[in-house]
Amino acid sequence: TLSWPAFGSSGNYVISRGGSRLATDFVAVDSTSKLTFTDTKANVDKYENYYRINRNGISILLSLENQIFGDNMYFYDRKYENVEAARNEINSHFSAIGRSGANGEWTTKRQAYYFKKNVKGQTYDPGGTGSASSPTANAIELGFYAHIGGLGKVPADVKLGAIFTRPHLSGGANATCTFWRSMENVAVMRDFAWTVSQSTSARRMLIESTSKYISDVGTNNFWGSGGFFADTHYSSARPNWGGQQQWYTRNTVFPSGTGAMGGSYNMVWQGCINPPAADNANSPIATTPIIREKPFLFIDDDGEYKVFVPAWQKDRVGVSWSSATMGKGKIQDLLADWYVAKEGDTDVELNNALKAGKNIFFTPGHYALNAPIQVNRKDAILLGAGIASVTLEPTEKNKWGCIYADDKDGIIIAGLLMDSFNSTTYQIRVGGEDANADHAANPILLTDITCRVGGVQSKNIEIHASMQINSNNVVGDHFWLWRADHGTQRGGNARWLRDRCKNGLIVTGDEVTLYALFAEHYQEYEVLWLGERGRTYFLQNEPPYDAPNQASWSSQGGRVNGYAAFKLANHVKEHHSIGMGSYAVFTGTDGNVNKSNGFEAPNSPKVKLEKMCITRFSGPGNIQNVINGIGGSTATGVKRVALYTNGDGKQPYDEEFDLPNRESYPVRH
């Protein structure tokens, strides 16, 4: 039975039914003066009943999918729609709200586009020729804060044509601000031009075409600052990353070969089949020691919406799925096991759902919090779609943070952007300061997490750390921790005083493993690691652009210029990292600001840092050494250190670290 509010001035409501939102088969099924209607001849699949209610030229659309998922999720079904319907709508959104330009970079709009399984003999590819950037390619253009997901069990269940992410800087040649978009669980049949930088995730994909991949912008001068790619199979050709500064690729299969695949400074390939051979820029790593893939939404054989939660795997090589099977994991019923959150839901509603034993699926939107989301039970999951944002609002009611997770087994936090318009201690914290549980059998997973400080707010804010990991056995799979280097507000010294945040990440837990860590522009140590037996596979960093002068930006009692991008405390006895880059861009200073070391670590036999790189992109200042006073300065170009362990460098001075304190935590209700 349908019901709707009164609208239109007079006459009956004319009711038409179609099999999907953009269906070509809408037919009139009734006309009534009432505000309700019972369809006695509905389609058998309850999700294949969309009703258009029309009166006096005004029309509304009702469906169960819209009732469950809200207005920011769009579903496509080739059983009922023309092949070009999805592409045309997505591209119209891309154009209408400026997603190709700087205005789109700061929009509060969020969208997710979900494709139902291919109908036999049909795909979502409207056909086309040429590279994805060409108008003749008929590509889907995916913009800011948008997500594409396949609702099949395996990527080949949903076949798309060409995909393009259009850069908006330097006439389309510069993708260094092409942020905040994602794709998963689909096949791309033609050109896949994923021309992106940070906070962009492409997972669980099948790339069937001969794809130029990252450099398809019609120019030889392209550059980008990506990126992250995982659990994907290239079936036809080895792609090329072109002018990417760096990239992290995990558990991906490429056609045979060992040749270079583009990129400039720091390309890490972990658990991949047929990666490039090792050289200065390329770091192939044989296996992924421990990983759990990100959960995802799909439609099961019974026609119901489910969430697949992949299992933990150790020492993995290649993808987690096959052409016929989803892979190892568990299936959860969305309506029975999950609370589906919609924009406007409050922290009270979200926390009540968690207390009731529900996991939370965040539909795309902007979630304003007056108190943190408190994840306080084993195996709880927070899963965002469409770059859903959980936000500290400027009301100052929430001075604690966006998400606090307790020291519990199996917690998953995925696909969320933490934003701040107010001062706080953290944006996200995992485990209290007294966390000491052993989670080795069922670790905590953080995946596709973005923390953003500044960029849009006009008031002064102060945050101690974007993220603090106190629990042991946490696995992080793709973070961008970002104190904004640009935005809608005035920069320079004003930004240094307005957007204050000391640390991007503080790790106090033991046996923490991080893949694809991006941390930029924080005002002190960008990554501060205090725990033992940690592992870091890939780091990308730029120091703050806007330190006014050297006196305002020095560490270790003023004895050291600036702060290292990655700081292992002197007491740490064991750590292993591979593939770390820090790049100087001191453009907002007095012209005399330098950083002494890209990285700092204790001289200990079991502290091993491999494949470190520093260079200068812009501005007069330099990074003066790679690590611990050795490796050379960016004043004379790119500098690299292949291995540092118990090395020849000078161990940093001992220091006490200013850590956030427990008194700032909220009262647990």
Ranges and model annotations:
Residues T1-S10:
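Conserved aromatic anchor
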Residues N12, Y50, I291-R292:
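Short hydrophobic/aromatic beta-strand element in the GNAT-like acyltransferase core
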Residues G8-S9, G19-A23, V154:
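Acidic glycine-/aspartate-rich tracts in secreted/extracellular proteins
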Residues V14-K46:
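Recognizes extended acidic, P/S/T-rich segments that occur
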Residues L61-H669:
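Extracellular/periplasmic carbohydrate-active domains that bind, remodel
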Residues S9, S33, N43-D45, L354, ...:
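Short loop/turn positions at the edges of beta-strands in beta-sheet-rich folds
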Residues F7, T38, L62-L64:
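Disordered, low-complexity "stalk" and linker segments at domain junctions of extracellular
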Residues D39-S59:
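Beta-strand-rich modules
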